[in-house]
Design a protein with these regions (language model features):
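FMN-binding flavodoxin-like domain, especially the glycine-rich phosphate-binding loop
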Residues: 1-19, 23-43, 49-192
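Iron-sulfur cluster-binding cysteine motifs and their immediate structural context
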Residues: 197-200
Length: 200
């Protein structure tokens, strides 16, 4: 049975995760003739409300990668407030042109523990939140074409009746957060570096 509704669920401090998740979710909704709804959990108030996606729906759930993992700020919300109720999920992570490390696996595990069946997963490059130079202009047109192909492939899988869970890459158990290092291999404390967040 095809999903009757596609949810775009995202945390997007700089807009690139929103752009990616909504593009994939809209493409799926259009391709499957399903309803579409967005849930933005970027601002703290949105993370005070539980989100339950009903059986028969599919949620494209996205977040950025921070230090190779799901941001620790989001863990309590994703662990305790997002529930699948038997719904399908597609975890999506954005990374700032270095690597997504274990973030996709971690998000997939969180969603599975919350009652979702993860039928795919995707990692896409986005402009880095701390630097407009790293991954500048990403996602770009070529990235969007990959997103469309990804969504089309998933729609074809669903049309074929395949809703089997998949295992995505990463290290299990999940590794510690990545520690940046200088050119001599010494750890660098980047806690003073703060991203600019678009609050509009």
């Amino acid at each position: 049975m095809l999903p009757d509704k596609i949810y775009a669920v995202y945390f997007s401090g700089t807009g690139t995760t929103k752009k990616t998740v909504t593009r994939i979710a809209r493409r799926l909704a259009d391709g499957l003739g399903a309803a579409y709804e967005e849930y933005d959990y970027t601002l703290p108030d949105a993370r005070q409300r539980a989100l339950t996606i009903p059986a028969g729906a599919l949620a494209v759930v996205g977040c950025p990668t921070y230090a190779g993992r799901v941001p620790n700020l989001l863990m309590p919300y994703l662990r305790g407030m997002v529930r699948g109720g038997g719904a399908l999920a597609l975890p999506v992570v954005l990374f700032g042109n270095r690597n997504y490390d274990d973030a996709l696996m971690e998000l997939s595990q969180l969603l599975t523990a919350g009652g979702f069946t993860c039928i795919g997963g995707g990692a896409f490059v986005g402009e880095h939140s701390f630097s407009r130079t790293l991954g500048a202009g990403r996602p770009n047109g070529a990235d969007e074409a990959e997103m469309d192909a990804f969504a089309d492939g998933l729609a074809a899988k669903l049309r074929a009746g395949d809703t089997a869970a998949v295992t995505v890459g990463g290290c299990d158990p999940i590794r510690p957060y990545y520690t940046p290092r200088d050119r001599h291999g010494n750890p660098i404390n980047i806690l003073k570096v703060k991203p600019k967040t678009d609050m509009s």
